[in-house]
Design a protein with these regions (language model features):
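Polyanion/phosphate-binding surface patch
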Residues: 1
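Short, glycine/charged-enriched hinge/interface segments at domain edges or termini
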Residues: 4-140
């Protein structure tokens, strides 16, 4: 879910009439792990597939927030007009595949889908075998 990773505690009083403004402390593209611990009053702009930064416990979709114009990238802010609940729009690691499940059986020809799935599971290397070439010569 593309949006802002937030601390639910910062948004307890957020409403249409009492919006909360948060400083955007970092931007997290897909596949990137955060090195910053989200502090009170901060949010992180996060893309689908990125790991939730430490300190964040929910995501507010971009469609439910307002990005304020800024001149300096260190001064980016967002306005949120509703309270958020714990784990809103957050999918836990491994939630889509059970531990120990076979995701690519031996002998299967790997597709782009398989490689994306393996990458999303943190599999960086896969042992593969070459399809054998066989020729039959009939001699009589």
């Amino acid at each position: 879910m593309d949006g802002y990773a937030v601390r639910v505690a910062d948004l307890l009083s957020a409403s249409q009439t009492q919006p909360v403004t948060l400083r955007v402390a970092q931007v997290l593209p897909a596949g990137v792990a955060s090195t910053h611990v989200l502090q009170p009053g901060e949010a992180a702009r996060i893309m689908t597939g990125a790991m939730l930064p430490e300190g964040a416990d929910a995501i507010v979709p971009f469609e439910e927030a307002e990005r304020l114009p800024y001149e300096d990238q260190h001064d980016e802010r967002c306005i949120i007009r509703r309270a958020s609940r714990l784990s809103d729009h957050v999918r836990a690691a491994g939630a889509d595949i059970a531990a120990g499940a076979v995701v690519a059986a031996k002998g299967r020809e790997l597709t782009a889908y398989d490689l994306a799935l393996l990458a999303s599971l943190g599999v960086a290397h896969v042992n593969v075998g070459r399809v054998p070439r066989v020729a039959v010569f009939s001699t009589g």
